[in-house]
Amino acid sequence: MAKDLDELLDEVETKFCRLDPLRLDLGERPKGDGGGGSHSGDRNGAQEKETLRSTETFKKEDDLDSLINEIFEEPDFDRKSFQKFKSKSSSNTCVRAPMQGVSKSCSPVYLSGSAIPCGIGTNTSQRACDRLRCVACDFRIVSYNDYMWDKSCDYLFFRNNMPEFHKLKTKLIEKKGARAYACQCSWRTVEELTDLQTDHQLRWVCGKH
């Protein structure tokens, strides 16, 4: 592939960077005997040479396009590598693409009542994680501020109704300061800041922010 690219660059340099002999020929027309000659004949000759020069230029461009197409049509040709190579050869200025945002996880992971704001939890910034996911049922955890779960909730209720709020609200009871959490297999009502690691029955993790 590197050999093909080198040949392509050599072809461009040979055909487009060298001096055009026809252009030189136009600038060095021989003088007639005694310095005379027909002006109309000179104009006709110049027009013919200009037409020939244009024809040769088009032929060179067609040959170059054909060479590029042949390289593109090879089965092992890597277009991305070619574009990268062409970009580097056309300019010495490197433009760095903006870095994508790096995902962050809570450490430790906190649950809390509605009085605690949600966000990325750390030892110094105690916030409730709002990107929780259950590794048991592979559901994202939903939470409802100022609600608690009714004591009659069971596994089948969440299994059949998650994550539709209009179905879940039949088991939600208003309670100021509480926050009701649930996935398809587990549920909790939390009022105080709680480290998730202290609840060994829950298989919830931070799904990254």
From Swiss-Prot:
GO terms for cellular component: cytoplasm; photoreceptor inner segment. Residues 40-58 have a biased composition (Basic and acidic residues). Residues 24-58 are annotated as: Disordered. It is found in: Cytoplasm; Photoreceptor inner segment. The keyword Transmembrane helix does not apply. Expressed in multiple tissues, including the brain, kidney, lung, spleen, heart, trachea and testis. Expressed in the retina (at protein level). GO terms for biological process: photoreceptor cell morphogenesis. InterPro entries: CFAP418. Residues 1-76 are annotated as: Required for interaction with FAM161A. Disruption phenotype: No visible phenotype. However mice exhibit progressive and simultaneous degeneration of rod and cone photoreceptors. Keywords: Cytoplasm. May be involved in photoreceptor outer segment disk morphogenesis. Interacts (via N-terminus) with FAM161A (via central region); the interaction is direct. This is Cilia- and flagella-associated protein 418.
